[in-house]
């Protein structure tokens, strides 16, 4: 009796754990549409200063160094500008900034 109860509990725990890990994997999967749209935004608005490879030989911030937890910093810099970078608030939509973030994060991870 105890063995059956233990087996049932183990199956439930495994099922819940598997479901949660599958859901996390789904959430973590890169959104290819956002990445492609972000590439367009980057190439038309950012590459001229930040370079084709997210870095411009010390002239601008090396975007490859952005960490996943720096999203608020990124959003603030893009919207309000920083140092020599002009503000893009009113030029780029929230969706474009989000797309840009996804593009940079995927490519920064690969560098």
Regions found by a protein language model. Give the residues of each.
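Short cysteine clusters
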Residues: 46-49
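C-terminal capping alpha-helices of c-type cytochrome domains
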Residues: 78, 90-111
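N-terminal export/targeting leaders of redox proteins
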Residues: 1-32, 111
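Residue-level detector of flexible, active-site-proximal loop/helix-junction positions
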Residues: 23, 70, 92
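Residue-level detector of conserved, well-ordered beta-strand and adjacent loop positions
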Residues: 64, 86-89
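Gly/Gly-Pro-rich "capping" loops immediately C-terminal to redox-active cysteine motifs
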Residues: 32-39, 51-82
């Amino acid at each position: 009796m105890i063995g059956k109860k233990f087996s049932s509990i183990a199956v439930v725990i495994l099922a819940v754990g598997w479901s949660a890990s599958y859901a996390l994997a789904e959430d973590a999967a890169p959104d290819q549409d956002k990445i492609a749209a972000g590439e367009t935004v980057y190439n038309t608005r950012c590459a001229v200063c930040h370079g084709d490879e997210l870095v411009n030989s010390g002239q601008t911030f090396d975007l490859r160094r952005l960490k996943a937890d720096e999203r608020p910093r990124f959003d603030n810099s893009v919207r309000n500008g920083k140092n020599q970078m002009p503000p893009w608030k009113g030029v780029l939509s929230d969706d474009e900034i989000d797309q840009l973030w996804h593009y940079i994060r995927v490519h920064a991870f690969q560098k």
